[in-house]
């Protein structure tokens, strides 16, 4: 069952690309059956440094990485479950609570977070301290 803190290893978007680690920021939204997700990339020049992750923050992370808020999205639970059942996505270890909290806090700080994602998060963040 998908829930806040889960991580998935899957490609970005509909067109096949190299898979990345994705983090679910919330439980499925009631009435919509969707979750808010962000992906984590290897640190590179000019990357969004609002929220950086390092070795120890998650077992999958082997070098400095960043949360790519520009690719954050609201995704249907059905779509993610379909990807999991057809092996286009794989579960990875859940995020530590303190890491999940940091990623959530930085979502509204990052200048790269899409406006629609900001608005969605503002509506649901009251459920997550």
Locate each region found by the language model.
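Loop/turn positions that initiate beta-strands
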Residues: 5-7
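Compact nucleic-acid interaction/catalytic patches
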Residues: 9-12, 16-60
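C-terminal terminal-subdomain/extension
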Residues: 57-129
């Amino acid at each position: 069952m998908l829930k806040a803190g889960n991580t998935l290893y899957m490609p970005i978007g509909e067109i096949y690309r190299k898979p990345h680690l994705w983090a679910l920021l919330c439980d499925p939204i009631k009435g919509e059956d969707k979750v808010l997700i962000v992906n984590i990339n290897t640190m590179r020049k000019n990357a969004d440094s609002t929220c950086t992750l390092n070795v120890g923050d998650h077992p999958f992370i082997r070098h400095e990485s960043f949360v790519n808020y520009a690719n954050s999205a609201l995704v249907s639970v059905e779509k993610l479950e379909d990807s999991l059942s057809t092996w286009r996505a794989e579960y990875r270890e859940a995020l530590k609570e303190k890491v999940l909290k940091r990623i959530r806090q930085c979502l509204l700080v990052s200048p790269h977070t899409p406006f629609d994602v900001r608005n969605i998060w503002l509506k649901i963040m009251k459920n997550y301290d």
